[in-house]
């Protein structure tokens, strides 16, 4: 089999494999299967549809789809004609979805037909946006496959590399688009992913248990596999035993997971785990959230030293650690990647000594630096000179290995998803009997953290009545993963700084 030329644009890598291995399955899912030839042809059709509808390089399109082949066709098409693509988290509320569609300036949105609320919200507030239903029918949208297949499916004669703009939640709860004016060179994390994965297209097959809209499953699981000519199974809804069953059935060799998945699989009875032949699996990459040492150790004890870990974010940065290293440095996320400098700084932006905690800063690349789209203040707040931070706290030991001791003071990480509590605070404060509220992450054995709301009530308020009303309020106003799992009412005042800001870290200390 021919090797893929180096540095070929992501959108065109599929075209290369469509010529060399046209009938090989590129994607298998509960929603359908695509060979490399089919995936490539449909991507071309969509690209030509966009051009025919007067979109030009630099224009924005969005995807709101589950893990299905159409997601990838809606991704690769725009990336071959110089457009900007934004996959959106379909767990968000219609209002949040519409905000991102408007903020990223999407001209076309491909969305699963089952999300009727999204179609209605977008059509009402952004009537000029072209809506397409990825599957089935919706009266407000064009049928995706039926529509694009009217257009030319041959390869684009003069492809232009597009780029993606993914969204990460802001500390105020509003999502932030991670924008780059130019594509950066391949990151060292991506290169280490390929090097350690060591794909063999003639034998390997990947499985993606995470949502394709998320930067990590897309960028470190799906894309590397397809670019290497390796097919991938897209799981629709993750289930521990189902994943083991699929690994056994398809003889999967590569995957990307988060710590919550490790925990759930390890929690399965031994007789359940032993039913499945997992001997084909030889590479598991994980990240997105800290993994307890005992959980990762248990995974390595069970699966062998095939568990690799990275530390990076949508914004960039990067550390990487191989299993043999991790066994010598349990809990570490690795050394800084080649070409990346890491500084641990105190509150005065002074470097701290090895072993001492501080905020983690990464050196920014000279090409393709990120900025938060239409948010200059948030962009400047993330940078310190030529360095940027995701707000994470950690330390570096004397050997240069980095350890995370917590995310930014406010961030809650539940099941690998970042949740910013200010948005939840603001919703609960809508209740007229809530005087003050502070949402925090508290330990959860399965998810890492879960959301707890700590509340000061107005004098004379009835706790039971208010609790019932708060549950209703959260149900109406918050996405499922943002709803508090528990509520606690305090008689004492919540701790505050002289500026009036609640000291969330002091509240959190009560529960850790």
Language-model regions, residue ranges each:
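Gly/Ser/Thr-rich phosphate-binding loop
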Residues: 166, 227, 252-257, 268-329, ...
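Structural core segment of the AMP-binding/adenylate-forming
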Residues: 52-53, 80-147, 157, 457-459
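Conserved AMP-binding A3 loop
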Residues: 35-37, 163-189
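Conserved pre-ATP/AMP-binding loop-to-beta segment of ANL
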Residues: 23, 149-169, 173-174, 198-205
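Conserved ATP/PPi-binding loop(s) of AMP-dependent carboxylate-activating enzymes
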Residues: 350-381, 417-419
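Conserved AMP-binding/adenylate-forming core of the ANL superfamily
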Residues: 6, 25-68, 72, 76, ...
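Conserved AMP-binding/adenylation subdomain of ANL enzymes
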Residues: 183-209, 213-254, 268
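AMP-binding/adenylate-forming catalytic core of the ANL superfamily
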Residues: 71, 92, 109, 245, ...
């Amino acid at each position: 089999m021919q090797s893929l030329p180096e540095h070929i644009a992501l959108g065109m890598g599929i075209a290369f494999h469509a010529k060399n291995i046209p009938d090989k399955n590129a994607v298998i899912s509960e929603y359908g299967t695509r060979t490399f030839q089919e995936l490539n042809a449909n991507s071309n059709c969509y690209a030509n549809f966009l051009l025919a509808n007067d979109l030009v390089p630099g224009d924005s399109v969005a995807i709101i789809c589950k893990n299905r082949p159409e997601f990838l066709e809606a991704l690769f098409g725009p990336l071959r004609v110089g457009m900007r693509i934004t996959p959106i988290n379909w767990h968000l509320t219609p209002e949040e979805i519409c905000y991102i569609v408007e903020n990223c300036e999407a001209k076309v949105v491909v969305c699963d037909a089952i999300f009727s609320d999204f179609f209605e919200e977008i059509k009402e507030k952004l009537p000029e946006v072209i809506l397409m239903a990825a599957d089935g029918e919706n009266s407000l949208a064009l049928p995706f496959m039926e529509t694009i297949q009217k257009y030319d499916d041959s390869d684009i004669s003069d492809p232009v590399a597009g780029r993606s703009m993914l969204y990460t939640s802001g500390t105020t709860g509003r999502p932030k688009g991670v924008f780059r004016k130019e594509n950066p060179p391949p990151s060292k994390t991506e290169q280490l992913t390929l090097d350690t994965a060591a794909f063999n297209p003639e034998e390997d097959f990947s499985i993606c248990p995470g949502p394709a809209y998320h930067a990590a499953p897309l960028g470190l699981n799906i894309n590397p596999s397809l670019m290497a000519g390796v097919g991938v199974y897209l799981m629709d809804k993750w289930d521990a035993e189902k994943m083991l069953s699929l690994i056994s059935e398809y003889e999967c060799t590569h995957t990307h997971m988060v710590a919550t998945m490790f925990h759930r699989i390890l929690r399965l009875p031994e007789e359940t785990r032993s039913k499945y032949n997992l001997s084909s699996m030889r590479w598991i990459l994980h990240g997105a959230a800290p993994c307890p040492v005992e959980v990762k150790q248990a995974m390595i004890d069970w699966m062998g030293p095939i568990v690799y870990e990275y530390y990076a974010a949508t914004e960039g940065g990067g550390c990487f650690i191989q299993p043999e290293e991790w066994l010598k440095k349990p809990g570490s996320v690795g050394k800084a990647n080649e070409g990346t400098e890491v500084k641990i700084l105190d509150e005065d932006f002074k470097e701290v000594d090895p072993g001492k905690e501080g905020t983690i800063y990464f050196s920014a690349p000279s090409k393709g630096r990120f900025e938060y789209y239409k948010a200059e203040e948030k962009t400047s707040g993330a940078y310190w000179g030529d360095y940027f931070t995701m707000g994470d706290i950690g330390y570096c030991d004397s050997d240069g290995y980095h350890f995370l001791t917590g995310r930014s003071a406010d961030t809650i990480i539940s099941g690998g998803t970042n949740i910013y509590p200010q948005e939840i605070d603001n919703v609960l404060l809508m209740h007229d009997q809530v005087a003050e509220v502070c949402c925090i992450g508290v330990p959860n054995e399965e998810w890492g953290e879960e959301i707890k709301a700590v509340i000061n009530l107005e004098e004379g308020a009835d706790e039971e009545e208010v609790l019932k009303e708060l549950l209703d309020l959260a149900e109406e106003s918050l996405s499922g993963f943002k709803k508090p799992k528990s509520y606690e009412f305090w008689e004492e005042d919540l701790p505050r700084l002289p500026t009036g800001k609640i000291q969330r870290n002091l509240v959190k200390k009560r529960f850790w």
